[in-house]
Amino acid sequence: MKTNFLIPGSQLDRMINYSDAEKIERRALGLPACEPAPGGLIKQLPKGRKVVSKKAITEPKVLNEAAEYGAAFVRGLRVDLPGGITQLLLSGTASVGPNGETLYPGDFRAQLWRTYHNLTGLLASEGATWHDIVRTTCYIRDIERDYGEFNSIRNEFFHALGLDPFPASTGIQARICRSDLLVEIEALAILVR
């Protein structure tokens, strides 16, 4: 049996239709089985344990916030660790403009350059550069067709930046969140402050 609920709000203004199996799993997570969970319901931090300092990374001059078009993630997350270590975890970033629109549909090369532009802006918003990047994960819609171009542009960009060594990297063929996006890159930067 399914139960329907309307969740008001800008991101969740839709009907929720919970199946019996969902209800079982929701209960196991401490959520109400048949109704939307209120924010902050689950508190799982053990007594006496500190929370790692986290902050969303934004750069509205370069690209908009994902939540503006209903996505449930942030563009990046800054995590401050003990000992003055900061990690910047940049979410999958693509050729998206400041208003959330896809830029350069059908042009793989231009989309890749814009993706690097967006990532550079996110890094700069936290005082970081590509020299702080230690790992990238690169999602390419058609890896057989576009990987040669991808590798050529990446090599040119990283050489122009003087990166030595290059970051660790993995290339994966993937269906990206929008059909007109051809490439998306996640990145991890580590800074010592």
Annotate each language-model stretch with its function:
Residues 1-117, 121-134, 140-193:
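N-terminal presequence-like segments and the immediate start of the first folded domain
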